[in-house]
């Protein structure tokens, strides 16, 4: 059934972990005739990324409050009210049938403004620990979804919306069927890179010696330094890039992924069907470690928390994994995947607006 006159405003920003899942849901609704508009901030990644997907974006001025100085905290109530009023103006102009909050600072004022106008609010929490904004908005939302168990006591667990090119990869047993020779290691630190991975992996690869290939995504402005570190360690064959343009192709190539455990990364690893060693970013609520827990528990991944990371420990962990074990991990990752989160969330939005 087409919904030619229905409109959704997606509220998401700051990081790819919020924006990409929002785009996945938006595409599902566009295929059913919905009009989509975005609410974001002008100085974060959504300002450039969202229009590339053919979606118009409105901006409000809002920043996070954690770790701010006294003057910023004193000004905060006025800034929040101003952001709510800005969001309200955009909502009154666009007149959406529902709003979808995917997290990030922009979701707070946008969600409150929508609620005050009587517009249904739908939330999706990508992490195993709910962000502050979503904790607040969950009290006023019509539907709340979570990617992993534990963020909310009574929200539906649906996984994270994942890009279709990742979902559509061949099954691990097909990819591994003709592989022999060197174990293929993919290192990903996100768009900004992960300094600890950039510092540790050249020495790990040197210690592992022959029998391994590596592709290393080093992040913004780090490619040359990391490439030089590999060369200095005597690892001449390392392929070091700043970004990976085709992530699905990189997952398909890899036998083993070494990476952080941000919400979207964990969901993509599972959807792709790749065995992983997670090195969670240190955070006081252990958010990334908790994101990875379910894949570790089912045998699809291993984890070394950052305070315990050493060249020796990571080298030993990699050395213990042969291709048969990596195939088993990849199969378990794929079996654990929830591949229809975008469809489930889109269907809920349709249902509450009928």
UniProtKB/Swiss-Prot annotation:
UDP-N-acetyl-alpha-D-glucosamine binds at residues 15-17, 127, 163, 191, 244, 263-268, 288. It comes from the Bacteria. It is found in: Cell inner membrane. One of its GO terms (biological process) is regulation of cell shape. GO terms for molecular function: UDP-N-acetyl-D-glucosamine:N-acetylmuramoyl-L-alanyl-D-glutamyl-meso-2,6-diaminopimelyl-D-alanyl-D-alanine-diphosphoundecaprenol 4-beta-N-acetylglucosaminlytransferase activity; undecaprenyldiphospho-muramoylpentapeptide beta-N-acetylglucosaminyltransferase activity. Its EC number is 2.4.1.227. One of its GO terms (cellular component) is plasma membrane. It is a peripheral membrane protein. Pfam families: Glyco_tran_28_C (PF04101), Glyco_transf_28 (PF03033). Pathway: Cell wall biogenesis; peptidoglycan biosynthesis. It catalyses: di-trans,octa-cis-undecaprenyl diphospho-N-acetyl-alpha-D-muramoyl-L-alanyl-D-glutamyl-meso-2,6-diaminopimeloyl-D-alanyl-D-alanine + UDP-N-acetyl-alpha-D-glucosamine = di-trans,octa-cis-undecaprenyl diphospho-[N-acetyl-alpha-D-glucosaminyl-(1->4)]-N-acetyl-alpha-D-muramoyl-L-alanyl-D-glutamyl-meso-2,6-diaminopimeloyl-D-alanyl-D-alanine + UDP + H(+). Keywords: Cell cycle, Cell division, Cell inner membrane, Cell membrane, Cell shape, Cell wall biogenesis/degradation, Glycosyltransferase, Membrane, Peptidoglycan synthesis, Transferase. Belongs to the glycosyltransferase 28 family. MurG subfamily. HAMAP family: MurG. Cell wall formation. Catalyzes the transfer of a GlcNAc subunit on undecaprenyl-pyrophosphoryl-MurNAc-pentapeptide (lipid intermediate I) to form undecaprenyl-pyrophosphoryl-MurNAc-(pentapeptide)GlcNAc (lipid intermediate II). PANTHER family: GLYCOSYLTRANSFERASE, UDP-N-ACETYLGLUCOSAMINE--N-ACETYLMURAMYL-(PENTAPEPTIDE) PYROPHOSPHORYL-UNDECAPRENOL N-ACETYLGLUCOSAMINE TRANSFERASE 1. This is UDP-N-acetylglucosamine--N-acetylmuramyl-(pentapeptide) pyrophosphoryl-undecaprenol N-acetylglucosamine transferase. The lineage of its organism: Bacteria, Pseudomonadati, Pseudomonadota, Gammaproteobacteria, Vibrionales. The gene is murG.
């Amino acid at each position: 059934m087409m919904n030619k006159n229905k409109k959704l405003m997606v509220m998401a920003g700051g990081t790819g972990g919020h924006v990409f899942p929002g785009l996945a849901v938006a595409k599902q609704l566009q295929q059913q005739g919905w009009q989509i508009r975005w609410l974001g901030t002008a100085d974060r990644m959504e300002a450039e990324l969202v229009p590339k997907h053919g979606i118009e974006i409105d901006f409000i001025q809002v920043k996070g409050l954690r770790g701010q100085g006294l003057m910023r905290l004193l000004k905060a109530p006025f800034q929040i009210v101003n952001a709510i009023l800005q969001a309200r103006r955009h909502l009154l102009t666009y007149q959406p049938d529902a709003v979808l909050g995917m997290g990030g600072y922009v979701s707070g004022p946008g969600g409150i403004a929508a609620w005050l106008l009587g517009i249904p609010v739908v939330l999706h929490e990508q992490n195993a620990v709910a962000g502050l904004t979503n904790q607040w908005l969950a009290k006023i939302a019509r539907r709340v979804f979570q990617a992993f168990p534990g963020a909310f006591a009574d929200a539906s667990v649906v996984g994270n919306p994942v890009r279709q090119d990742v979902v559509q990869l061949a099954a691990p047993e097909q990819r591994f069927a003709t592989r022999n020779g060197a174990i293929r290691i993919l290192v990903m630190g996100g768009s900004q890179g992960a300094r600890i991975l950039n510092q540790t992996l050249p020495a790990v690869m040197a210690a592992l010696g022959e029998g391994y290939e590596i592709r290393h995504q080093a992040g913004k402005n780090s490619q040359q330094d990391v490439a030089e570190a590999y060369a200095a360690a005597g690892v001449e064959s390392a392929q070091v890039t700043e970004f990976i343009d085709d992530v699905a192709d990189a997952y398909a190539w890899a036998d083993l992924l070494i990476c952080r455990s941000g919400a979207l990364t964990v969901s993509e690893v599972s959807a792709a069907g790749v065995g992983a060693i997670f090195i969670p970013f240190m955070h006081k609520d252990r958010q990334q470690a908790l994101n990875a827990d379910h894949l570790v528990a089912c045998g699809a991944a291993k984890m070394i928390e950052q305070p315990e990371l050493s060249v020796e420990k990571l080298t030993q962990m990699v050395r213990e994994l042969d291709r048969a074990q990596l195939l088993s991990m990849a199969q378990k990752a794929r079996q654990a995947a929830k591949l229809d989160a975008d469809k489930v969330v889109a269907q809920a939005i349709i249902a509450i607006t009928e």
